[in-house]
Amino acid sequence: REAVRIVREGGADILMKGIINTDNLLHAILDKEKGLLPKGKVLTHLAVMQIPTYNKLLFFSDAAVIPRPTLQQRIEMIWYAIHTCRSFGIEQPRISLIHCTEKVSAKFPHSLDYVNIVELAEAGEFGNVIIDGPLDVRTSCEQASGSIKGIVSPIDGQADVLIFPNIESGNTFYKSVSLFANADMAGLLQGPVCPVVLPSRSDSGLSKYYSMAMACLTCK
């Protein structure tokens, strides 16, 4: 709470979790009177990784905060991703809405949300971005996969951002790619008045360093 107070009073621009329980920090951030989350803002998590076999940075959300995002929360997640991509110099981010298949089905309510989001994007709601889905991870990030499946998408296997349907898939992706693909990672909480670095206990020192660098890039 003392660190949150310092940020609120202008004494710091970035908040980083140390050796404390994550819940304690989140409670301080979410405090309605003395916290850091403005009224009406959504608290979520955005990560970015550099994978040796991918030709660009890859952002993704949410691997840490929202169990099952609502449509409005997904829209906010996309806006956070857009603003962060612009901080990294990506003027027209390609955002892929992730599912296990490219088919829309009422059995998977998030796929219905995706249809609404794509329609908003096509109407210009998000500005200069490319959004498509549902798509699976491989079709989102590998051009040949879409060609083999006969899937035509403006993402064209060159996604900058992956929006996952729930925290289980996002978190599994986060840990799998860092473990098996030797990816370098960084991540921040999105929504508070300042960047919040929330490292996992198993994150490497380099990952924490990259997260601090990401916070500096996105700092207002």
Segments predicted by a language model, with ranges:
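Anion-binding alpha/beta catalytic cores of soluble intermediary-metabolism enzymes, centered on
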Residues: 1-155, 160-220
